[in-house]
Amino acid sequence: MTNLYPKRTRTKLANKQKMIRVAINLFARKGYQATTQEEIAQDANLHLQTLYRHFRSKEELAIAAAELSVSDCNERFKNNFSHANTFEIWRKWIKSSSSFLLSLGIGEEKRDRLCSASSLMNDNYLLIIYSGYEDLLTHYIAQDFCMDVKIDRLPRLVAGMLWNGNEAAMKRCAGKDTQSNNLHNVNHVLAESLAVVDDIEAVFKGHIKLQRRSHELFSDTHSSSQFGPMGER
């Protein structure tokens, strides 16, 4: 029994991580409301009861998924912030994470949510993850701008623009403003999502005061946890 316990523990942890990763992808592709716990268990090749042993509700799973997604993004920032600014890191994060999820396809449920009058209210995952990404971006933007968030409101304002820019880009691609559905066009969605980051950077880049070394390579490891232009991760 002594020898089996560590193996069982590792298996439980691996199963839990697998379910969280699958949930991140499904929430991004279909939206929180349209994703069922049965689908998550099935895509993770696990029994539904295994999922319930780890997560008593879908909301509990969404919280874990949001925390992991923000943690992945934070690792990207920690690995690159000494030689790249917030806008550069965020742009590459959007590109790599979104490319992965777009390759899996966006469901019609997701498009319907994006075009609805209450798109955020219908997606608990987005509501849960919002504060995590906004806090993360605020932290690094404040360092870039050499500002104190206790005094200056600009870092959180810019962070909110970067985060909400993902939702804005996806709404445009879903036809909210353009009356043309381009969610199936990976290149179009990526271009729209990155253009949002570029537009915000063009306005606020002049506020960057932090000096950096320029000789280091950018760490751009792939992440399967989503957020990117879907507005989730």
Which residue stretches match the model-derived regions?
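C-terminal peripheral helix-coil segments that are non-catalytic and often amphipathic
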Residues: 2, 138-146, 168-233
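Short amphipathic alpha-helical segment with a characteristic S/N-K-E followed by hydrophobic residues
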Residues: 19, 57-62, 72-73
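Basic, helix-initiating cap at the start of DNA-binding domains
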Residues: 1-30, 34-46
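Short hydrophobic/aromatic patch on the recognition helix
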Residues: 44-55
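Hydrophobic alpha-helical connector segments
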Residues: 75-111
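Residue-level detection of the helix-turn-helix DNA-binding "recognition helix"
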Residues: 42, 56-57, 67
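Amphipathic alpha-helical packing segments from all-alpha helical-bundle domains
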Residues: 118-146, 153-160
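Alpha-helical DNA-contacting segments of helix-turn-helix folds
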Residues: 15, 60-69, 129, 133
